[in-house]
Amino acid sequence: MMTTHKQVNIYTDGSCLGNPGPGGYGIVMQYKQHSKEIADGFALTTNNRMELLAPIIALEALMEPCIVTLTSDSQYMRQGITQWIHGWKKKGWMTSNKQAVKNVDLWKRLDSVSQRHNIDWRWVKGHTGHKQNERCDKLARDAAEAKPKQIDTGYQESL
């Protein structure tokens, strides 16, 4: 008997007040009629780190391999995971101009957690009224504005 994987829709966004500064991420996950929201904040981080951490946390929350449609307004995250990452891995996590890949800790985590799922990475233009993207944006901003105390150790170690 063939098992069918669950189809899950995930929407993510990251926010940073100042860049670097306090930051947060927002996630909306939908499966059939169920919906779950996740958000968290960090005392000092960057917008790109929050844009990467959101899909990591969302995918890590899935208890089994799923068919995922993941929608984000971050071209950086989407292009990184669908295009740039292949070259980075071949070059030992270096860019084409021999620089260390920024946020490599998160890129490695995203690469790893992506392997167990079948993911359609989609991009949506931010701040254009896309319901779930707007909700993620609010969750992320609220988390960043809540004076978060949590330390983004990956960011601190890169300084």
UniProtKB/Swiss-Prot annotation:
Main location as per UniProt: cytoplasm
Positions with a binding annotation for Mg(2+) 1: D13, E51, D73
GO molecular function, one term: magnesium ion binding
Key words of the record: Cytoplasm, Endonuclease, Hydrolase, Magnesium, Metal-binding, Nuclease
Domain RNase H type-1: 4-145
The protein's Enzyme Commission number: 3.1.26.4
Cofactor(s), names only, from the UniProt record: Mg(2+)
A Pfam family reported for this protein in Swiss-Prot or TrEMBL: RNase_H
Source domain of life: Bacteria
NCBIfam families: PRK00203.1
Quaternary structure and partners: Monomer.
HAMAP family on file: RNase_H (MF_00042)
Family designation: Belongs to the RNase H family.
Protein name: Ribonuclease H
Protein species of origin: Shewanella denitrificans (strain OS217 / ATCC BAA-1090 / DSM 15013)
Upper taxonomic lineage: Bacteria, Pseudomonadati, Pseudomonadota, Gammaproteobacteria, Alteromonadales
Name of the gene encoding the protein in the UniProt record: rnhA
